[in-house]
Amino acid sequence: MDTVIFDLDGTLLDTLEDLTDSVNYAMEQFGFPVHTIAEIRTFVGNGAPKLLERSIPQGVENPAYEAVLAAFKAHYAEHCEDKTRPYEGVTEMLAELKGQGYHLAIVSNKFDGAVKKLCKKYFGEFISVSIGESAEVKRKPAPDTVYRALRELGCDGSRAVYVGDSEVDIQTAKNASLPCISVTWGFRSEEKLRSEGAPENRLIRTPQALAPLLARLRTEE
């Protein structure tokens, strides 16, 4: 095992406040009710279109849906770095893995421009491949972004592992035939991850726990 594919939001970066602010900006522009951070936490994971579908009354059936989505994207593109920060220990974790020779990539359902912007700002010295949502590739849980990341890295999927914080990530890894490591510090509770099939020996509660788990998995190959 020499390759680690990471989810972004809720795994490497705490983006929840900026996402909430941009959703609520879009809601206010069109006179719709705003949402709490706790509500937005349950809405995220499937990309901006689904996030706004869950946020706006009547979802995609609302005549204003496309305009609200566009307002969200425009606001978030300008404000995605306002309050977003790496989770404590994540930068050190990536430095450790890079130093051990792992190939690292990010795949996300966040729109591609924001993914690349955030990756470059926070993790550019560790991660060279970052792929987000675009018209060119199916979003997670389809395995397409994972396959693209592996191609861009020049790595074999049989030697890769996927790391994420949600049920979408568990399903993505399954669809890509990769083992999945689930983190408990993100947008889903440990109970939720367990209910979605995350095994105890593939759950980690701190970033510092990833390198030892990867080392153990390598011995099992």
Feature names for model-found ranges:
Residues 33, 103, 179:
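Residue-level detector of anion-binding/catalytic polar loops
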Residues 29-59, 88:
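Alpha-helical substrate-recognition element adjacent to the catalytic core
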